[in-house]
């Protein structure tokens, strides 16, 4: 396998990306293309599935060409993707019968309430690890079957195929030869039993979704089959699939029970590897499958924060306090601390572990001495505080004391935020050299399947440290900071609950 590389396809919510990795896990070339966001009604979010495919195929070819290579240089392809986003297509034509309904879409919220009223919540959580929510794929499939003309009849005839974005890409890369998904994506549908590792007939019946629509569920790292498209002249093994947060956990090499990563993006996604047994959360976290390699399954606890880096965008676009995101660190550093100011950025409610949809953004502790720098500091602090709330819930659920926090995503470049995160969590925040951990995770899963890398131990040895942030704030100050945050959260909830 001299001079061969792994191609990782990272199909995200706003863009399709492709990256070529070498044997040491270094990025050799990249390509990226944004695509259209479709908002037919308030609360509805859609993508054009054909555009998802065309942009992803385009950047795959571009990344390889940019590196001066062709398909013969690629040992395998790994796919990682935005999760839960739902596509239904006609098996005979290969054409979608409706746009992709995106994970953010809330059109099925009322239907989810009906399912809860029927008493299904406990059963769904016990089987799938998930709460009943429009976030997940199941109710989106049901909406398409109920609202697209002729869909129900075609489904009964076995003509319709459902897939998350990974399934759609594999279907197109193999010209309809493979209709598959992996366990991580299946575990986000609200239809997959994470204990038996099978589609759940009882849930399919409750939601009136024909089993014939569903893809075959495979491991996250195995050779599924070769590409058959004209994107590449030669056939390349498709060999790794994982949802974006699962791939990031693997790319961060959080392969042991109790290891945790936090991706600081627009929101924050915190995931803890819990080993070979699923842990049912008592603290409003989601239980999910981390990945499957061979027969080995790893489970995870996950907590999502709605507003992470988005709070910095609000300071820029909403308040005009900063001109660009990079300025926030300089402004926030100009004061020694937030001076008692707390920002609860519940612009769209509060996510894990609070799950309060009615809460709204609130600013506390403001005096005549409060400056834009204090507000900037409070905004950065809020990202760290929300992360601590989730991490403490993970510790409570798992009974595992977190040893360190591995960090990635755009906002982890902010040294002030990372230091404060370490301070109030009381453990090191560790930033890797390769920041593209999601794509790297997909590459690793594919490379393992084809023997490009020998085993996980070899991958562990590749993980390189950029910077370690060690707690430095005295315990009394940490306690005072956290007590103030808890008061702010209580007050924000009280504001939401007061008529």
Curated annotation (Swiss-Prot):
The keyword Isomerase does not apply. Pathway: Polyol metabolism; glycerol degradation via glycerol kinase pathway; sn-glycerol 3-phosphate from glycerol: step 1/1. GO terms for molecular function: ATP binding; glycerol kinase activity. It comes from the Bacteria. ADP binds at residues 13, 17, 266, 309, 410, 414. It is an enzyme of class 2 (transferase). Glycerol binds at residues 83-84, 135, 244-245. InterPro entries: ATPase_NBD, Carb_kinase_FGGY, Carb_kinase_FGGY_CS, FGGY_C, FGGY_N, Glycerol_kin. CDD domains: FGGY_EcGK_like. Sn-glycerol 3-phosphate binds at residues 13, 83-84, 135, 244. ATP binds at residues 13-15, 266, 309, 313, 410. HAMAP family: Glycerol_kin (MF_00186). Belongs to the FGGY kinase family. This is Glycerol kinase.
């Amino acid at each position: 396998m001299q001079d061969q590389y792994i191609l990782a396809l990272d199909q995200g919510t706003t863009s399709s990306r492709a990256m070529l990795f070498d044997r040491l896990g270094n990025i050799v070339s990249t390509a990226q293309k944004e695509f259209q966001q479709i908002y037919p009604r308030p609360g509805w979010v859609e993508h054009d599935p054909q555009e998802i495919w065309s942009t992803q195929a385009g950047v795959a070819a571009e990344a390889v060409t940019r590196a001066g290579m062709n398909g013969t240089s690629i040992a395998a392809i790994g796919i990682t993707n935005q999760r839960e986003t739902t596509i239904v297509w006609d098996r005979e034509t290969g054409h979608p019968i409706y746009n992709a309904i995106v994970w953010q879409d809330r059109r099925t919220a009322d239907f989810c309430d009906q399912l809860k009223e029927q008493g299904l919540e406990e059963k769904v959580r016990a089987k799938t690890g998930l709460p009943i929510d429009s976030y997940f794929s199941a109710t989106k499939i049901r909406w398409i079957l109920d609202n697209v003309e002729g869909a129900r009849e075609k489904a009964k005839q076995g003509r319709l195929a459902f897939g998350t974005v990974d399934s759609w890409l594999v279907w197109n890369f193999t010209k309809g030869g493979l209709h598959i998904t992996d366990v991580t994506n299946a575990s986000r549908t609200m239809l997959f039993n994470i204990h038996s590792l099978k589609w759940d007939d009882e849930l399919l019946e409750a939601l009136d979704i024909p089993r014939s629509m569903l893809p075959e569920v495979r491991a996250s790292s195995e050779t599924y089959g070769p590409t058959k498209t004209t994107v590449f002249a030669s056939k390349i093994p498709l060999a790794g699939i994982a949802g974006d947060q699962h791939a990031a956990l693997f790319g961060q090499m959080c392969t042991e029970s109790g290891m945790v990563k936090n991706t600081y993006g627009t929101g924050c996604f915190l995931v803890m590897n819990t080993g070979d047994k699923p842990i049912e959360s008592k603290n409003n976290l989601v239980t999910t499958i981390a990945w499957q390699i061979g027969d080995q399954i790893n489970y995870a606890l996950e907590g999502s924060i709605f507003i992470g880096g988005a709070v910095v965008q609000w300071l820029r676009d909403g308040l005009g306090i900063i001109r660009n995101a990079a300025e926030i660190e300089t402004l926030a550093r100009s004061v020694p601390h937030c001076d008692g100011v707390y920002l609860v950025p519940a612009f769209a409610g509060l996510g894990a572990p609070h799950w309060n949809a009615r809460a709204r953004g609130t600013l506390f502790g403001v005096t005549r001495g409060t400056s834009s720098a204090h507000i900037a500091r409070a905004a950065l602090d809020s990202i760290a505080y929300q992360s601590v709330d989730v991490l403490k819930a993970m510790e409570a659920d798992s009974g595992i004391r977190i040893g360190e926090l591995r960090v990635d995503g755009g906002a982890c470049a902010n040294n002030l935020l990372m230091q404060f995160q370490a301070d109030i969590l009381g453990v090191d925040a560790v930033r890797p050299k390769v920041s593209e951990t999601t794509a790297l995770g997909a590459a690793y899963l594919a490379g393992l399947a084809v023997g490009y890398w020998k085993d996980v131990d070899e991958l562990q040895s590749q993980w390189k440290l950029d910077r370690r942030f060690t707690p430095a704030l005295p315990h009394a100050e940490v306690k005072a900071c956290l007590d103030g945050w808890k008061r702010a959260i209580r007050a924000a909830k009280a504001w939401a609950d007061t008529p």
